[in-house]
From Swiss-Prot:
Belongs to the PetG family. GO terms for molecular function: electron transporter, transferring electrons within cytochrome b6/f complex of photosystem II activity. The 4 large subunits of the cytochrome b6-f complex are cytochrome b6, subunit IV (17 kDa polypeptide, PetD), cytochrome f and the Rieske protein, while the 4 small subunits are PetG, PetL, PetM and PetN. The complex functions as a dimer. One of its GO terms (cellular component) is cytochrome b6f complex. It comes from Mesostigma viride (Green alga). NCBIfam families: PRK00665.1. SUPFAM superfamilies: PetG subunit of the cytochrome b6f complex. This is Cytochrome b6-f complex subunit 5.
Length: 37
């Protein structure tokens, strides 16, 4: 039962981590675009 709980936590963290990386990359892209202008 502990293994299923850990697997659930991992599966829940993966989308959050991917979303965080995507948002960070998007903000850095916007910031670089603003610096060019």
């Amino acid at each position: 039962m502990v293994e299923s709980l850990l697997s659930g936590i991992v599966l829940g963290m993966i989308p959050i981590t991917l979303a965080g990386l995507f948002v960070t990359a998007y903000l850095q892209y916007r910031r670089g675009d603003q610096l060019k202008i």
